Swiss-Prot record:
Protein's job: Probably involved in the osmoprotection via the biosynthesis of trehalose and in the production of glycogen and alpha-glucan via the TreS-Pep2 branch involved in the biosynthesis of maltose-1-phosphate (M1P). Catalyzes the transfer of glucose from UDP-glucose (UDP-Glc) to D-glucose 6-phosphate (Glc-6-P) to form trehalose-6-phosphate. Probably also able to use ADP-Glc, CDP-Glc, GDP-Glc and TDP-Glc as glucosyl donors.
Pfam families given in the database record: Glyco_transf_20
GO CC aspect terms: cytosol
Region annotated Disordered, chain positions: 1-20
Record's protein name: Trehalose-6-phosphate synthase
Length: 503
């Protein structure tokens, strides 16, 4: 489970790895699983950054003598003599820092990755910005990651590249180290063909991904879009037929190479969350949360990173209108919205936060009482223990993104409900909706539909609630994050031909 507090476990066990060490399994991601913390006295500490990806890949890294390549999270001057790129040993893993300057962060990360690719890949909810200077820095930083992977990987090693910030790395790494087996997984949605074609550097992105032996997406639709683009932009020969989930892979014949394309829905460490939710301390904290809220009859909950894709404004409008129409009683129902700060220097995010906080004030001004707000809003990191307790305390979980690659919060809520209580209202435009069919599915672009789904979830019978939650838990507990990682790596290791006609 992602720790929304950012309060990782401090570790003093980091030490430089032997310079000759080579890894048989390498993960390449924008961030390391630990963050560098520069202390006032000039010394450095490392803070662990828990998350779903770390949970999935740490055991694999240890078993396979693996290395993780990524940015430590602190911008540094490239000429800084203290900005070492030497590998670090941390809890049995080799971590290889890639240093980024403040200009790199501004242009490669905040610019091209998050103001160009992020909105484009999320259905252009906010208009993407195209700057050649950002693109050039994206190319440069991707090359830096590829070179680090080439130096780190042993002969014939497996390299797994992660996410939209590093889409050029597979091709660059292939050119540097043709002996490697390379996989790539995209953790956000892959856009429809017509939207992707807006990208000025569309061909370079597709070519970059085709440097991999296996390109993975959350959903078959993303894989199908990629196959169409490879055919249209590069004239590649691609397989016919539909891509399945963890099966029926697509194939691209590109030059002298064949590239597999597949769908692998990511998940969570559901068994660990289930166990955590059962503890006496968690159950007690959940009771305390409800008491702090005034012991309402019903508690609605939203947990999101503060992002325009998450549909926070949609659920606030729906909640407000349900109150106005008398379909929810403000005396016995509260909504808690936990919003983790995100990209606070980006103007569109600043404006979005201001708009959401205006909505919160309006709802409480209209329907709250002194000492009894009907909408509780927290804009700060939330400790992991409190998050689990909030999941246990909530009667209805609201997950209403306009577009989301998967949305692990929905799965986290389900994993915490061993009591078979609660209800999940889930946007149809999340990857999770394809798996969590017993949720109250809704179209976040249709406000009346969102309101109806919330009302139905609030008023479900205990029998209906248990039936739905039992089915949801069966899915989430069976398909955990370890199974996701193993299914991808098994497909990457397999060299079996794909028996489908091509065109």
């Amino acid at each position: 489970m992602t720790d929304q507090s950012g309060n990782g476990v401090r570790s003093g066990s980091a030490s430089e790895a032997p310079p000759s060490a080579k890894a048989d399994f390498v993960v390449v991601a924008n961030r390391l699983p630990i963050d560098q913390v520069n202390l006032p006295d000039g010394s450095t500490e490392w803070k662990r950054s828990p998350g779903g990806l770390v949970t999935a890949l740490e055991p694999l890294l240890r078993r396979r003598h693996g290395a993780w390549i990524g940015w430590p999270g602190v911008p540094e001057d490239a000429d800084d003599p203290d900005a070492s790129t030497e590998p670090i040993e941390q809890d049995g893993m080799t971590l290889v820092p890639v240093r980024l300057s403040a200009a790199d962060v501004a242009k490669y990360y905040e610019g091209f990755s998050n103001a160009t690719l992020w909105p484009l890949y999320h259905d252009v909810i906010v208009k993407p910005t195209y700057h050649r200077e950002w693109w050039e820095r994206y190319v440069e930083v991707n090359r830096r990651f590829a070179e680090a992977a080439a130096r780190t990987a042993a002969e014939g090693a497996t390299v797994w590249v992660q996410d939209y910030q590093l889409q050029l790395v597979p091709k660059m790494l292939r050119m540097l180290r043709p002996d490697l087996t390379i996989g790539f997984f995209l953790h956000i949605p892959f856009p429809p063909v017509e939207l992707f074609l807006q990208m000025p550097w569309r061909t370079e992105i597709i070519e970059g991904l085709l440097g991999a032996d296996l390109v993975g997406f959350h959903l078959p639709g993303g894989a199908q879009n990629f196959l169409i683009l490879a055919r249209r932009l590069l004239g590649a020969v691609t397989s016919r037929g539909n891509v399945g989930v963890r099966s029926r892979f697509g194939e691209v014949q590109f030059g002298f190479r064949k590239v597999k394309v597949g769908a692998f829905p990511i998940s969570i460490d559901s068994a660990e969350l289930d166990q955590h939710a059962r503890t006496r301390a968690t159950r007690q904290r959940a009771k305390e949360i409800r008491a702090e809220l005034g012991n309402p009859r019903k508690v609605l909950l939203g947990v999101d990173r503060l992002d325009y894709t998450k549909g926070i404004d949609v659920r606030l409008r729906a909640f407000s209108e349900l109150l106005e129409e008398g379909r929810i009683d403000p005396e016995d129902t509260v909504l808690v919205q936990l919003a983790t700060p995100s990209r606070e220097r980006v103007q569109s995010y600043i404006e979005m936060r201001e708009d959401i906080e205006r909505q919160v004030g309006h709802v409480n001004g209209e329907f709250g009482k002194v000492g009894h707000p009907v909408l509780h809003y927290l804009h700060r990191p939330i400790p992991r223990e409190d998050l689990v307790a909030f999941f246990v305390a909530a009667d209805v979980m609201l997950v209403t993104p306009l577009r989301d690659g998967m949305n692990l919060v929905a799965k986290e809520y389900v994993a915490c409900r061993h009591d078979l209580g609660g209800a999940l209202v889930l946007s149809e435009f999340t990857g999770a909706a394809a798996e969590l069919r017993q949720a109250y599915l809704t179209n976040p672009h249709h406000l009346e539909g969102v309101k109806d789904a919330i009302e139905a979830a609030l008023n479900q019978s205990p029998e209906e609630g248990r039936r739905r939650m039992r089915a949801l838990r069966r899915q989430v507990l069976a398909h955990d994050v370890d199974r996701w990682a193993r299914s991808f790596l098994d497909a990457l290791a397999s060299r079996e031909p794909i028996n489908e006609e091509s065109h």
